[in-house]
């Protein structure tokens, strides 16, 4: 037998031997969907976005409940990052207290605080229409989107 023919026969035999081995099983297709990460950013109807920083374990905030909130607020830069700080309850150490749902705070807070539990921390990204809008406020220019880090310290 010629060397080239011998090589061909050996190659065919080697391939046939490998074909007899069981093929590695492919993973079975899965219909399950990975659970969403509770720390992903969530966009609410109306445009408020929030991201859980820490999930609380106490009572939940709901309309009609008196909430105590520590917060820091920043203007949002055009690239989405935090801009200059305009207010913080942490500067005084006293939480802001109000009844959720009575319209005493900006609408973005009314929406973004609902469902939080005492001890929870969230970052809220609030479009200008749900903040101070075209009028702005003393330290907030008109049409500014805002970023707040909030901590729910109590519910009554």
Can you describe what each PLM-predicted range is?
Residues 2-156:
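Cross-family detector of peptidyl-prolyl cis-trans isomerase
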């Amino acid at each position: 037998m010629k060397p080239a023919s011998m090589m061909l026969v050996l190659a065919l035999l080697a391939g046939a031997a490998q074909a007899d081995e069981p093929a590695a099983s492919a993973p079975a297709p899965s219909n399950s969907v990975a659970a969403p990460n509770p720390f992903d950013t969530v966009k609410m109807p109306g445009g408020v976005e929030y991201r859980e920083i820490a999930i609380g374990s106490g009572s939940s905030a709901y309309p009609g409940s008196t909430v105590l909130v520590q917060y820091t607020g920043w203007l949002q830069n055009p690239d989405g990052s935090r801009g200059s700080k305009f207010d913080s309850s942490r500067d005084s150490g006293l939480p802001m207290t109000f009844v959720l749902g009575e319209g005493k705070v900006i609408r973005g807070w009314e929406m973004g605080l609902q469902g939080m539990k005492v001890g929870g921390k969230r970052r809220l990204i609030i479009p200008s229409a749900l903040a101070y809008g075209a009028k702005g406020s003393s330290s907030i220019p008109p049409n500014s989107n805002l970023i707040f880090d909030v901590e729910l310290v109590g519910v009554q």
